[in-house]
Swiss-Prot record:
One of the Pfam families matching this protein, by short name: Anticodon_1
UniProtKB keywords: Aminoacyl-tRNA synthetase, ATP-binding, Cytoplasm, Ligase, Nucleotide-binding, Protein biosynthesis
Family membership: Belongs to the class-I aminoacyl-tRNA synthetase family.
Catalytic activity: tRNA(Leu) + L-leucine + ATP = L-leucyl-tRNA(Leu) + AMP + diphosphate
Molecular function per GO: aminoacyl-tRNA deacylase activity; ATP binding; leucine-tRNA ligase activity
Species the sequence originates in: Salmonella typhimurium (strain LT2 / SGSC1412 / ATCC 700720)
Classification via SUPFAM superfamilies: Anticodon-binding domain of a subclass of class I aminoacyl-tRNA synthetases, Nucleotidylyl transferase, ValRS/IleRS/LeuRS editing domain
Motif ('KMSKS' region): 619-623
Record protein name field: Leucine--tRNA ligase
Cell compartments where the protein resides: Cytoplasm
Motif ('HIGH' region): 42-52
């Protein structure tokens, strides 16, 4: 064994061994308990960042630990390879998205291997290959036949200059990110999957997810947004159709003083024909894309359409306004307004001088004061005719019943959740497998024409999708009739919604999934990824699992038993102000800092001498130039050090502050373990451990070893507090380093302890542990070694600590055998010099003894 720890030599050698032996390749084995450990698959952006490293290290620690428990562990990896960034990069680098993507995959795969992650590479998938997306296309056609897929027009962001659809992220201040043209809202036909058909089940089954974070479940509950209310129909004077609204507060119905419709509503469009102000307002709304999140804070605007609706219970005429806070794509595109009891309606009514009618009493029973704001709390009705005096629930039911009786209202459960629009007008995605005949008939692509392959050898102009720009690509025939292919591609959330299931059978050619393999491995036992995916990906992931279940492919209801959301990785951020007042962000690697006695940064400059402003720790990002390249750290310290720091610096679900001093500390610890094993093995063979022959000190040390095993097992396995597990191993190492190494049983005990330490560290630092296990004469490869088991007998305490008081004041602590009598404890206390001096020349008048805990001597 070399005296010096040299990670660069060890790590490449061990990685080669894993590759050659295919250590982490697994197959279904009914005789073993399975464990499926999955980290969210990466987008091949070009390089791994620290967020990736943290996510995958957590996954690898769990997988290696479970493997040592004797389970059949599947830990796969792949590439979420379609998406918009590839198109931008291709234009910038004058290439096509496919070669750019495949080059990135090759580079990042090498990076993952360098970090020593124990993946089953035989199951690697890239979602941009026809071998993968063909099954997604086939499944989509089956969902279409089941009535779960439909096409309808929907509003998108349209750049009139580039003649293309923009994602919300590509609209900057209402303009196209590329050419700065004013963006318009345009209705175009798009494909949707009916996720709303599963809304109730998606909501209900959240209760089954005991091992998912409550925050994620709450976010999904709110996103699905189930509400119970009443749908009410209004007649409108001089308009051919009725207006339908939905309300969760029918108790306030007698206070409805106006209706509001979306600018795109047919009623508003009709009224605009003779109303120039309204036409201009509709035009303005068309060109302002409003994210739902901004709705609450934006200025509420509207124009009177001139139409009057008839209140179904009072017969009163109430005005119908067009308003910018009503969205056509939500509900019916019309809302009833009760300004007395809804703040948004109140602000709008106050602005335009509309009637505000109170119908709910204040909590003290008085009429509410509406001079400043609406009264939004529930309460008792007044000003409501026959419903006066009713509280919320009774009023809800009475008014709902009355409306139903008159045929103008019905109770309804509504969801905030909208159907999933899966069409993207981009090139780099899986083609949507639908065709249109010359007579306009829309059909799914016949199975014998699947997959519809995306051409990869294309020229990108940065504006139009190559498959839209080439009219020949779309031409095909179906049953001998000419047809045109759909040129839209799937939303990339499609691929990431079922990849976890395909990992169970990536080579399977008979269909989307091999049910036998899928049902052996699924559900996923632990799924690890960022909380930013709480609603989009994690909802589609659950939805797709239910679709596959209903297609008979899987039997479980949910895709993953446990979800672990890792925290972000933060780093110091610095900038200097440039000549034009702009901020120039400087990498923390290039900042020369001065710290105070508490280690806080007080001054910083860069190599060019710029005075730097320190903004504190923030998420590693390109925009702040504060990302640390994992590659550089691995080259400097080794993969094991980077992994150990990642797991030790913070609990897995909390933010992690990147500190190179902490990385150095992790490196020093590994060197200490190496040094102790080196010194121990240099002394030659070790005798067998004879537990019965151990001295009290040796027993105490062995007790510490086994208590540590018990703690680390609990910390990793049950609590998943990996940082405290590492801290416990470090504490034990301190004791082992000070332990005597000369006697035969000292060395035998150290051998047992070091073999345990190396196995406990193996999930965190697998390369160095692989090597040290061999040096310690461990049986076989450590990858197949069992997890150490704590010896219950060794952990039994045979001594205990007793606090000694004289006249109620603590004067010392003594160690006594667990079974010591009161007499023996008193005798031992008298020998303790700190206690003895208080007993000199005095009489003990009374003794209070709490067995094994406290001895109080009352003297006079």
């Amino acid at each position: 064994m070399q005296e010096q720890y040299r990670p660069e030599e060890i790590e490449s050698k061990v990685q080669l061994h894993w590759d050659e032996k295919r250590t982490f390749e697994v197959t279904e084995d009914e005789s073993k308990e399975k464990y499926y450990c999955l980290s969210m698959l990466p987008y091949p952006s070009g390089r791994l960042h620290m967020g990736h490293v943290r996510n995958y290290t957590i996954g690898d620690v769990v997988a290696r630990y479970q493997r040592m428990l004797g389970k059949n562990v599947l830990q796969p990896i792949g590439w979420d390879a379609f998406g918009l960034p590839a198109e931008g990069a291709a234009v910038k680098n004058n290439t096509a998205p496919a070669p750019w993507t495949y080059d990135n995959i090759a580079y990042m795969k090498n990076q993952l291997k360098t970090l020593g992650f124990g993946y089953d590479w035989s199951r690697e998938i890239a979602t941009c290959t026809p071998e993968y997306y063909r099954w997604e296309q086939k499944f989509f056609t089956e969902l279409y036949k089941k009535g779960l897929v439909y096409k309808k027009t929907s509003a998108v962001n349209w750049c009139p200059n580039d003649q293309t659809v923009l994602a919300n992220e590509q609209v900057i201040d209402g303009c196209c990110w590329r050419c700065d043209t004013k963006v318009e809202r345009k209705e175009i036909p798009q494909w949707f999957i009916k996720i709303t058909a599963y809304a109730d089940e998606l909501l209900r089954d959240l209760d089954k997810l005991d091992h998912w974070p409550d925050t994620v479940k709450t976010m999904q509950r709110n996103w699905i947004g189930r509400s119970e209310g009443v749908e009410i129909t209004f007649d409108v004077k001089g308009y051919d159709n009725t207006l339908t609204v939905y309300t969760t507060r029918p108790d306030t119905f007698m206070g409805a003083t106006y209706l509001a419709v979306a600018a795109g509503h047919p009623l508003a469009q009709k009224a605009a024909a003779n109303n120039a102000e309204l036409a201009a307002f509709i035009d303005e709304c068309r060109n302002t894309k409003v994210a739902e999140a901004e709705m609450a804070t934006m200025e509420k605007k509207g124009v009177d359409t001139g139409y009057k609706a008839i209140h179904p219970l009072t017969g009163e005429e109430i005005p119908v306004w067009a308003a910018n806070f009503v969205l056509m794509e939500y509900g019916t595109g019309a809302v009833m307004a009760v300004p007395g009891h809804d703040q948004r309606d109140y602000e709008f009514a106050s602005k335009y001088g509309l009637t505000i009618k109170p119908v709910i009493l204040a909590a003290d029973g008085s009429e509410p004061d509406l001079s400043e704001q609406a009264l939004t709390e529930k309460g008792v009705l007044f000003n409501s005719g026959e419903f006066d005096g009713l509280a919320f629930e009774a009023a809800f039911n009475a008014i709902a019943d009355k409306l139903a009786e008159k045929g103008v209202g019905e109770r309804k459960v509504n969801y905030r959740l909208r159907d999933w629009g899966v069409s993207r007008q981009r090139y780099w995605g899986a083609p949507i497998p639908m065709v249109t005949l010359e007579d306009g008939t829309v059909l799914p692509t016949p199975e014998d024409q699947l997959p519809v392959i995306l051409p990869e050898d294309v020229v990108m102009d940065g504006i139009t999708s190559p498959i839209k720009a080439d009219p020949e690509w779309a031409k095909t025939t179906v049953n001998g009739m000419p047809a045109l292919r759909e040129t839209d591609t799937f939303d990339t959330f499609m691929e990431s919604s079922w990849y976890y299931a395909r990992y169970t059978c990536p080579q399977y050619q008979e269909g989307m999934l091999d049910s036998k393999a899928a049902n052996y491995w699924l559900p996923v036992d632990i799924y690890i990824g960022g909380i930013e995916h709480a609603i989009m990906h994690l909802l589609y992931f659950r939805f797709f699992h239910k679709l596959m279940r209903d297609a008979g492919m899987v039997t479980s209801d949910e895709p993953a038993k446990q979800l672990l959301c890792q925290g972000m990785v933060l780093a110091d951020a610095f900038y200097y102000v440039g000549e034009n007042g702009e901020r120039n962000w400087v990498s923390p690697v290039d900042a020369i800092v001065e710290r105070d006695e508490k280690g806080r940064i007080v001054k910083a400059k860069d190599a060019a001498g710029h005075e730097l402003v320190y903004t504190g720790m923030s998420k590693m990002s390109k925009s702040k130039n504060n990302g640390i390249d994992p590659q550089v750290m691995v080259e400097r310290y080794g993969a094991d050090t980077v992994r150990l720091f990642m797991m030790f610096a913070s609990p897995a679900d909390m933010t992690l502050e990147w500190q190179e001093s902490g990385v150095e500390g992790a490196n020093r610890f590994i060197k200490r373990v190496w040094k102790l094993v080196y010194e121990h093995t240099a002394k030659g063979p070790v005798a067998a451990l004879n537990v019965d022959a151990l001295s009290e000190d040796q027993k105490a040390l062995r007790r510490d070893v086994h208590k540590t095993i018990a703690k680390v097992t609990d910390d990793i396995g049950r609590r998943q507090t990996f940082n405290t597990a590492i801290a416990a191993i470090m504490e034990l190492m301190n004791k082992l380093a000070k332990a005597p190494q000369e006697g035969e049983q000292d060395r035998a005990l150290l051998q047992e302890a070091l073999q345990a330490v190396v196995r406990m560290l193996n999930p965190f630092t697998p390369h160095v542990c692989f090597t040290l296990w061999q040096e310690l004469g461990g049986e076989g490869d450590i990858d197949n070694a069992p997890w150490p088991v704590a010896d219950e007998q060794a952990m039994v305490e045979n001594t205990t600590l007793v606090v000694v008081q004289v006249n109620g004041k603590v004067r010392g602590k003594i160690t006594v055998p667990v079974d010591a009598t009161e007499e023996q404890v008193r005798e031992r206390a008298g020998q303790e010099h700190l206690v003895a001096k208080y007993l000199d020349g005095v009489t003990v008048r009374k003794v209070i003894y709490v067995p094994g805990k406290l001895l109080n001597l009352v003297v006079g």
